[in-house]
């Protein structure tokens, strides 16, 4: 008998994956956690029934959420990641030679532990790097307790439900601004404009109310609903579209390129209409 994973993040649409093997499934203090091996996309991290990442395409998300803000900032030395227990974002951050310290703040220790065990190629030992500090705890509380400390804050969260819901609130972005240095930058994954336009619009508006420079950029991520995903970047000073990205990167990537950095900010008309005007049916 075939076993299928059915993901129902969108109420009127589902995605299904044929499972080869269930590697772990448990109830943690915060969520249901599973790691499954699928035929189509390899091993996947699944939280509360929603796919978070897969071995086959994880690099798209992790490269885009990292290199866009880190190349926008002229000298990022200290970076905070809220969420991101799989370690992929830390892996990409530590490719930048200017980075002296990267803090991973993950609320669920089981995510870190099980990803190290079953998805080791995602972190690629980055969490053991001397520049990385892993803090198990509430990201909102951590941000509130640190002022004028980080050059870049990356919200590498699950979807805006359950434990991650507070990470999408407008008041939280004000706290992030206080956590950042005077020319700091923040970025967050902000869902798909196809199925969740109201979230994309709300986060964009909330960021714009706090950060003078707020932009939306896009990436093609097959694992996620619609395959077309948005990220919102907020900056106190620096424009990500004018970032001085080197013509040749000093490290290897699979998705991000200097030309793609600029191109990712070119939005289709329906997304422009969404963020620059009222949502229409």
Swiss-Prot record:
Its main location: cytoplasm. It is found in: Cytoplasm. Pathway: Amine and polyamine biosynthesis; spermidine biosynthesis; spermidine from putrescine: step 1/1. It is an enzyme of class 2 (transferase). Coiled coil: none annotated. The active site is at residue 156. One of its GO terms (molecular function) is spermidine synthase activity. S-methyl-5'-thioadenosine binds at residues 31, 106, 138-139. It catalyses: S-adenosyl 3-(methylsulfanyl)propylamine + putrescine = S-methyl-5'-thioadenosine + spermidine + H(+). GO terms for cellular component: cytosol. Spermidine binds at residues 62, 86, 156-159. Keywords: Cytoplasm, Polyamine biosynthesis, Spermidine biosynthesis, Transferase. It comes from the Bacteria. Pfam families: Spermine_synt_N, Spermine_synth. The keyword Transferase applies. InterPro entries: PABS, PABS_CS, SAM-dependent_MTases_sf, Spermi_synthase, Spermidine_synt_N, Spermidine_synt_N_sf. Its EC number is 2.5.1.16. Residues 2-236 form the PABS domain. GO terms for biological process: spermidine biosynthetic process. Catalyzes the irreversible transfer of a propylamine group from the amino donor S-adenosylmethioninamine (decarboxy-AdoMet) to putrescine (1,4-diaminobutane) to yield spermidine. Belongs to the spermidine/spermine synthase family. Homodimer or homotetramer. This is Polyamine aminopropyltransferase. It comes from Clostridium tetani (strain Massachusetts / E88). The gene is speE.
